[in-house]
């Protein structure tokens, strides 16, 4: 079987590669005429071609810098994480700022590396009360309801309406509440740039980018709820069994296929932007 398959593979490859100049010219003309779609861009190409207006300056206070031990050749290793802006995961990111202020992670370790899933770090002795590192006393405890953010909690800069009012609109014999946006032209332009509504997926009614962050949406009008979604490079909070939601002392980063089943089961607090 091997002696048969190898020549066949070579013949097939040759048939694909050795196209005549006329065939290549015809394909180029078809693409130029719009009859065929160009090849999708690679992530690096998308970044390289992004216009200046698509970039946003990250506030320094939203950056979490983690320096690891040098590698085997003595090369420094640094990971830079951007924390999520309010109102998303606000309690957990607040805890992380307190943990950084207390230098909680200094000298701790990466405790878990699972290929195509996550890398997790924190206090390896956290479950041993005699050896566990003390946590700051004023850390918040968040309920599971904080995994989602209601539309009323969204700050104006993340909502496409400059002013949001609740109006009672008659519908048949009943009334219902609906959001009535009154955006200025400036806000409309900003919303068009920041908000990228996409299709439905298996885990949410809609998914979109809002202010550059990947979010899922469920519900409409004043009942709408938003939550961050697990994508490559997103940083989340390790926790114990429900209803525990974690403090932020144990963190992980997604390093493989997006584990979307973790959405609204674990808090997301940021994303790796370098390292």
Can you say where each PLM-predicted feature lies in the sequence?
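Cyclophilin-like peptidyl-prolyl cis-trans isomerases
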Residues: 25-274
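Bacterial N-terminal signal peptides that target proteins for export
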Residues: 1-11
């Amino acid at each position: 079987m091997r002696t048969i398959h190898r020549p066949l593979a070579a013949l097939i490859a040759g048939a694909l590669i050795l196209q005549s100049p006329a065939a290549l010219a015809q394909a180029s003309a078809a693409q130029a005429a719009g009859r065929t779609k160009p090849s999708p861009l690679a992530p690096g190409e998308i970044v390289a071609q992004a216009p200046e207006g698509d970039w946003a300056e990250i506030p320094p206070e939203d950056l979490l810098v983690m320096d690891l031990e040098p590698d085997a050749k003595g090369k420094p290793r640094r990971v830079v994480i951007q924390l999520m802006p309010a109102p998303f995961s606000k309690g957990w990111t607040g805890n992380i700022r307190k943990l950084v202020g207390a230098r909680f992670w200094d000298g701790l370790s990466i405790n878990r590396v699972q290929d195509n899933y996550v890398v997790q770090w924190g206090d390896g002795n956290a479950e041993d009360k005699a050896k566990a590192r003390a946590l700051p006393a004023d850390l918040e405890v968040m309920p599971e309801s904080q995994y989602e953010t209601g539309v009323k909690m969204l700050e104006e800069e993340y909502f496409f309406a400059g002013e949001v009012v609740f109006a009672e609109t008659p519908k048949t014999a009943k009334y219902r509440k609906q959001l009535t946006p009154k955006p200025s032209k400036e806000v409309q332009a900003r919303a068009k740039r920041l908000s990228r509504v996409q299709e439905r997926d298996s885990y949410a009614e809609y998914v979109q980018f809002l202010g550059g962050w990947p979010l899922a949406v469920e519900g409409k009008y004043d009942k709408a709820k938003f939550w961050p979604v697990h994508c490559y490079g997103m940083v989340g909070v390790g926790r114990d069994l429900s209803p525990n939601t974690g403090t932020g002392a144990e963190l992980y980063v997604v390093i493989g296929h997006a584990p979307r089943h973790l959405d609204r089961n674990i808090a997301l607090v940021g994303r790796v932007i370098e390292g």
